[in-house]
A protein has these predicted regions:
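Structural signature of tandem alpha-helical TPR/SEL1-like repeats
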Residues: 7-19, 40-53, 74-87, 91-92, ...
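Canonical tetratricopeptide repeat
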Residues: 2, 33, 67, 98, ...
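Structural marker of alpha-solenoid helical repeat scaffolds
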Residues: 23, 57, 88-91, 118-119, ...
């Protein structure tokens, strides 16, 4: 799939993999790669179909189980995700990071951090999230600072500031997050992380 590795546009990648499937219908890899593209496009039902086809052809294809595990996380089915990552790992794939993500949702924050940072740099959103949930606020703040500034990372910074009672900083980050992504208004409105700010005129002005 060298040609697809040179292509950045998802639609074009998808066409390359579809052509490969038509040309080599008994090769599992194009099905798996097309499934990965479908995940990126948000078409999870189609992705599962393609990945299961890949496994029917080659039930030792670790990436197919790994990608099905990613879909399971998206669908909030963490037990299935853990099982699929275990299968992928037994077939030789490094699944530390994805297992770490599962452990965030299971509430095993320290384990999640250790798994996600074992083979990856600390500069990662999910690492910062796990550190925040594990109440390691100083470390979490340093981690999130190295990330690209967008609505999601600014919102996490607002949460960290709210948890450490720095209301001014929380409002500042929240305002910047909303400016980046207006949908954050509705999220913040109902988020108990900001419960102690709900009656503040500055907060109300941000979420109106």
């Amino acid at each position: 799939m060298y040609a697809a590795s040179l292509v950045k546009e998802l639609k074009n990648k998808e066409m390359i993999y579809i052509t490969a499937i038509e040309t080599y219908p008994n090769n599992a890899e194009p099905y798996c790669n097309a499934g990965a593209v479908a995940i990126e496009k948000g078409n999870h039902k189609h992705a599962k179909h393609l990945l299961n086809q890949a496994i029917e052809i080659d039930d030792l294809l670790s990436e197919a189980y790994n990608n099905l595990g990613i879909i399971a996380i998206i669908e909030n089915d963490y037990e299935s995700a853990a099982s699929l990552f275990k299968q992928a790992k037994e077939l030789g794939l490094n699944t530390n990071y994805n297992e770490g993500v599962v452990n965030i949702y299971k509430g095993n924050y320290d384990k999640a951090i250790k798994l996600m940072t074992k083979d990856n740099p600390n500069c990662d959103y999910n690492v910062a999230l796990a550190q925040t949930l594990d109440k390691k606020y100083t470390i979490a703040e340093e981690t999130v600072k190295c990330l690209e500034e967008n609505g999601k990372t600014l919102y996490l910074q607002a949460v960290i500031a709210a948890r450490t009672k720095d209301i001014e900083k929380s409002l500042k980050h929240l305002a910047k997050a909303i400016k980046k992504d207006n949908k954050i208004k509705n999220i913040a409105k109902n988020d108990m992380e900001f419960a102690n700010m709900h009656d503040m005129p500055e907060f109300v002005a941000l979420i109106e």
